[in-house]
Amino acid sequence: MGGLMKKNTLILGIESSCDETAASVVKNGCEIVSSVVASQIESHKRFGGVVPEIASRHHVEQITLVIEEALKQANVTMDDLDGVAVTEGPGLVGALLIGVNAAKTLAFMHNLPLVGVHHIAGHIYANRFETEFQFPLLSLVVSGGHTELVLMKADNEFEIIGETRDDAAGEAYDKVARTLGLAYPGGVQIDKLAKDGEDTFHFPRAMMDDGSFDFSFSGLKSSFINTLHNLRQRGEEPNPNDMAASFQASVVDVLVSKTIRAAKQHGVKQLLLAGGVAANQGLRERLIQEVKLELPDTELIIPPLSLCGDNAAMIAAAGTVSFLQGKRSNYDMNANPGLLLEDI
């Protein structure tokens, strides 16, 4: 099938790790030919979070339609493709299985190479649509389930030099938003309120100066919930804008200061922002500001909002790198909810 002989490499990406069903056709790992995302936010809203059974059911309903639509928008057939890339893990096992089984079936039926992709590798490679990577580079990955600093010295070589010891930042955002009675997904709502508020509560900045690159957000979450509870006990209703701004200031301070310190220590050429929380305006603005001041020679890459949340273009981009390195998954590949980034 000589995919590598052709000038262009066309990969179909499939993503179903949580509550988005997505498919995308990507050319040469850096050009989006089509990208289709079916979101389930409305279905999970009334539960205040993702319900795994509902997510799986939605994936079953959407997967075929989404793949067909991605091929149609790209104006290609399965025979034009060089391979199929799919999120293998981590994520919700029932959700992952839908995408993995669809990818395995398509690859098998059309005799195409299959490439399993780590979900976080996908988030990092979403930045590949912005510019070429120059190593060494550092990624700040911030999402609902992950908060990590990932050092890369070459394509597909990941070293986690810092990670959360408890809650991920996105998780803390959602829990705090719920306490304030905000709609799901909470991170977006907190970010909006924070714009019009002040950091009047000065919540703790955990592990800010401990010398490590690790994070902790459970103390901040508890402090926020206790402060709100105590104020309400006294019959006071705090300004939600100030509460949101104070919470966000604490998270952003820690994320940005540790990221800048790690980037300096490792002398990176590029600094990448990745993951769902990369859409947060407060975080984006602060990172741009600090990099200008502290790391004038480092290129900061921030993905467009459309590529921050879960999508399949990023999976196809990461999959293309593995594909061109000759990596292949067997047709008996299984969903792996505990897949580690450093093991791929």
Swiss-Prot record:
Signal peptide: none
InterPro entries: ATPase_NBD, Gcp-like_dom, KAE1/TsaD, Peptidase_M22_CS, TsaD
Sites where the protein binds Fe cation: 119, 123, 310
Recorded GO CC terms: cytoplasm
EC number: 2.3.1.234
Disulfide bond positions: none
Places the protein is found: Cytoplasm
Function: Required for the formation of a threonylcarbamoyl group on adenosine at position 37 (t(6)A37) in tRNAs that read codons beginning with adenine. Is involved in the transfer of the threonylcarbamoyl moiety of threonylcarbamoyl-AMP (TC-AMP) to the N6 group of A37, together with TsaE and TsaB. TsaD likely plays a direct catalytic role in this reaction.
Gene field: tsaD
Cofactors that this protein relies on: Fe(2+)
Protein name: tRNA N6-adenosine threonylcarbamoyltransferase
Chain sites annotated for binding substrate: 141-145, 174, 187, 191, 280
Major site of localization recorded for this protein: cytoplasm
Gene Ontology terms for molecular function: iron ion binding; N(6)-L-threonylcarbamoyladenine synthase activity
Pfam families assigned: TsaD (PF00814)
GO annotation terms (biological process): tRNA threonylcarbamoyladenosine modification
Record's keyword annotation contains Signal: no
Highest taxon in the source lineage: Bacteria
Reactions that this protein is recorded to catalyse: L-threonylcarbamoyladenylate + adenosine(37) in tRNA = N(6)-L-threonylcarbamoyladenosine(37) in tRNA + AMP + H(+)
Native source species: Listeria innocua serovar 6a (strain ATCC BAA-680 / CLIP 11262)
Keyword match Phosphoprotein: no
Cofactor note: Binds 1 Fe(2+) ion per subunit.
